[in-house]
Design a protein with these regions (language model features):
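Metal-dependent amide/peptide-bond hydrolase catalytic core
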Residues: 1-6, 177-187
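N-terminal helical capping/dimerization or prosegment-like subdomains
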Residues: 1-78
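Conserved hydrophobic "DFG−1" position in protein kinase catalytic cores
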Residues: 55-57, 91, 180
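Active-site metal-coordination/substrate-binding segment of hydrolases
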Residues: 64-128
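Residue-level marker for buried hydrophobic side chains located in beta-strands
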Residues: 67-69, 157, 183
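Histidine-centered active-site/metal-ligand motif
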Residues: 72, 170, 186-187
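Acidic/histidine-rich catalytic neighborhood of metal-dependent amide-processing enzymes
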Residues: 108-175, 179
């Protein structure tokens, strides 16, 4: 379906488009549309629920194990301390800067490129690509809304900027809308 030489620049262009389209949690329709258009342009049959997009490898067989490739396309809102326009992707010294480039646009487009590379190949497992919404707020319309409709994951690759370190970092989530003064940050 795709060779690495073609997929890398296509993934970078998709990431630039995702960065250029604000996609705050619950407001991801534009980025969901971009992902859908990209995959359909590769003749991938997609499924969509709200702003969640998913696709199965073309040789999907329920008797084979299933590998999930999952990342999200929503972002937090930019803080006032940004030194660059967060919606204008810039490549500087080989790094692409912009809101969501690291968490988690870069991992997402990498997984999309991986999926496109392997989709037509005869694999001993199924691939399931999931581009989920509302991850930044653990929203009810994100991946949790899809779990009961998807096949069990025998293995999952989750695109998050963790430096490949496993950690228990959250036991729950409390969302409070408040106005706070000080230096902004995102963990």
């Amino acid at each position: 379906m795709g060779e690495t030489k073609e997929l890398f620049p296509e993934a970078v262009e998709l990431l630039k488009k995702l960065i250029s389209s604000p996609s705050f949690s619950k407001e991801e329709v534009k980025t969901a549309d971009l992902i859908q258009q990209f995959l359909e342009g590769k003749q991938v049959e997609i499924h969509r629920s709200g702003n969640n997009i998913w696709a199965f490898s073309s040789n999907y067989n329920p008797s084979l194990p299933t590998v999930w490739l999952n990342s999200h396309h929503d972002t937090v809102k930019p803080n006032l301390g940004y030194t660059k326009d967060p919606f204008s992707p810039i490549i500087d010294e080989g790094k692409l800067f912009g809101l969501g480039s690291n968490d988690a646009g870069g991992p997402l487009v990498s997984l999309i490129a991986t999926f496109c590379h392997f989709i037509g190949k005869d694999l001993p497992f199924n691939l399931l690509l999931i581009a989920s919404a509302e991850e930044e707020i653990s929203g009810p319309n994100g991946i949790a809304s899809l779990i009961s409709h998807l096949p069990k994951a025998d293995l999952a690759i989750v695109g998050e900027p963790t430096q490949m370190r496993l950690a228990v970092a959250e036991k729950g989530l409390l969302v409070i809308d408040a106005k706070v003064h000080g230096k902004a940050g995102h963990a």
